[in-house]
């Protein structure tokens, strides 16, 4: 089988498949396809996988060809469905594989990477493998895998969070600087000038004594008292 014929048929099949289900009559094939999740190989079909948005999940497929003729694996895709109502939520990007020829009675392995980015909820992942056989492309569904998807917890040391914190800090510092330049300088200048005026007024109102002055034992200045009055006080004291 020529590779160009395989790829032409593969493209035509994708174009005519609605929801990855063939529009013609279903055919039975003796091709067994299973997979494991490399990150959690212990999970089975009955388990529920727990994934976070941003994770990369690797599916490792095993294709067993029990047909009498050779088959060729040419592509892989898949869907996330709502496990309650079976509605399709999103389709995975169709990926090219190989092509990898599988002779009768033999098996091959290949990987598919899936980037998890969905609204947090419960889903069922159903992969599909494209097989070329006898100039036809066959879409073979694999078992479903239940999964719970949640948002990843944000770490304090996450570079994106650190960058956001720096942006907020710089913005806050810039607002403070602008506020000081517009209102702060004028306010502090006004307060300083008022204090200077109060100090000058206090100095001007203080009396300044000129010339020598004497104080009596009574503790007040006697220069301004007439001498006759002072003599009278002294005479009274002698008596």
Curated annotation (Swiss-Prot):
Residues 20-161 are lumenal. It holds the Pfam family TRAP_alpha. The keyword Lipid biosynthesis does not apply. It is found in: Endoplasmic reticulum membrane. GO terms for cellular component: endoplasmic reticulum membrane. Residues 183-239 are cytoplasmic. Residues 1-19 form the signal peptide. InterPro entries: TRAP_alpha. Residues 201-213 have a biased composition (Low complexity). It is a single-pass type I membrane protein. The chain crosses the membrane at residues 162-182. Keywords: Endoplasmic reticulum, Membrane, Signal, Transmembrane, Transmembrane helix. Coiled coil: none annotated. It comes from the Eukaryota. The keyword Nucleus does not apply. Residues 201-222 are annotated as: Disordered. Belongs to the IRC22 family. Is probably involved in a pathway contributing to genomic integrity. This is Increased recombination centers protein 22-1. It comes from Candida albicans (strain WO-1).
């Amino acid at each position: 089988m020529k590779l160009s014929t395989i790829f032409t048929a593969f493209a035509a099949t994708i174009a005519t498949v609605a929801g990855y289900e063939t529009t013609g009559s279903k055919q039975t094939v003796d091709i067994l396809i299973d997979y494991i999740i490399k990150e959690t190989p212990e999970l089975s079909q009955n388990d529920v996988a727990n994934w976070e948005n941003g994770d990369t999940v690797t599916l490792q497929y095993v294709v067993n060809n029990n047909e009498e003729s050779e088959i060729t694996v040419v592509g892989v895709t898949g869907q996330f469905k709502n496990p309650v109502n079976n509605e399709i939520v999103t389709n995975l990007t169709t990926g090219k594989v190989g092509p990898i020829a599988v002779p009768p009675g033999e098996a091959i392995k290949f990987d598919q990477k899936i980037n998890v980015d969905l609204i947090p909820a419960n889903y069922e992942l159903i992969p599909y493998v494209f097989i070329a056989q006898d100039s036809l492309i066959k879409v073979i569904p694999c078992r479903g895998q239940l999964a719970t998807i949640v948002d990843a917890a944000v770490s304090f040391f996450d570079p994106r969070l650190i960058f956001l914190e720096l942006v907020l800090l710089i913005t806050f510092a810039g607002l403070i600087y602008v506020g000081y330049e517009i209102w702060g300088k004028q306010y502090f200048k006004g307060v300083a000038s008022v204090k200077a005026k109060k100090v000058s007024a206090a100095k001007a109102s203080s009396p300044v004594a000129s010339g020598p002055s004497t104080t009596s034992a009574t503790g007040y200045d006697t220069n301004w008292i007439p001498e006759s009055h002072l003599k009278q006080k002294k005479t009274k004291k002698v008596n």
